[in-house]
Amino acid sequence: MASLLCCGPKLAACGIVLSAWGVIMLIMLGIFFNVHSAVLIEDVPFTEKDFENGPQNIYNLYEQVSYNCFIAASLYLLLGGFSFCQVRLNKRKEYMVR
């Protein structure tokens, strides 16, 4: 039977920690972009043309960046799930008799 174990216990634990931090940070950033935080205007990819038609174009760009943050957070969540599975497989491997 083929094993799905491909990471050691330390790498898997590191993956869980980094994934948890990435999910928390990106969800918070997504929320702040979604409420159109003025502090984050430097991180919105706008051009001079976007300022001509009022704030609606800028708000749409804020929401697009917000969606990108939520998508990245979901990818970090998947990576955290994979790392958790690797931790479980490593613990199971310790108790198996060879």
Curated annotation (Swiss-Prot):
Cystine crosslinks: none
InterPro entries, per database record: Ribonucl_Kappa, RNase_K
Transmembrane segments: 13-33, 65-85
Tissue specificity comment: Expressed in brain (at protein level).
EC number annotated for this UniProt entry: 3.1.-.-
Predominant subcellular localization, coarse grouping: membrane
Alphabetical list of Pfam families matching this protein: V-ATPase_su_f (PF23489)
Protein's GO biological process: endosomal lumen acidification; pH reduction; proton transmembrane transport; receptor-mediated endocytosis; receptor-mediated endocytosis of virus by host cell
Annotated Gene Ontology cellular component terms: clathrin-coated vesicle membrane; endomembrane system; vacuolar proton-transporting V-type ATPase, V0 domain
Family: Belongs to the RNase K family.
Protein name: Ribonuclease kappa
Organism: Bos taurus
